[in-house]
Amino acid sequence: MGLAQPLNPSVDRNSENPMNSVVLLEFLRSHRLAVQASVSSASRPQAAVIGIAVSDRFEIVFDTLETTRKAQNLRHNSNIALVIGGLTAGDERTVQFEGEADEPSGSELERLKMVYYSAYPDGPSRVNWPGLTYVRVRPIWVRYSDYNANPPQIVEYRGEELV
């Protein structure tokens, strides 16, 4: 993986504190929670806090039950948005992450389970839960915003720049 540079250099407003894909991956992995948003077949919004893990390919992985609204929504419409960060008082850094979700199987599922279990060692204890599924989100568009910096640093990436 080479270092991805910003999608739009004019959006990178703070050249003294450059963001690159390595720093972005570290930021994502330093957070275990995200807020995900999806849309139902009736065009109703849904959001929930989820536990996440992040692969070297910038894939976000989480587990959920097949009966949840998020799982049902993503089976109808695979587009998903997540917000990561911004949960700690005084730390105004966030990532907006838009992607496409799927439920991998076979060797891909096993690879992603290992990513998830590295972040959540208790994950294997849930593997036999009825209806448990794993969701992978591949990045389409990512924006890192650091409002702690002066001026604020905002950097955008296309998904293909990160994988």
Predicted regions and their residues:
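Charged, gly/pro-rich active-site loop segments
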Residues: G2-E16, R93-V163
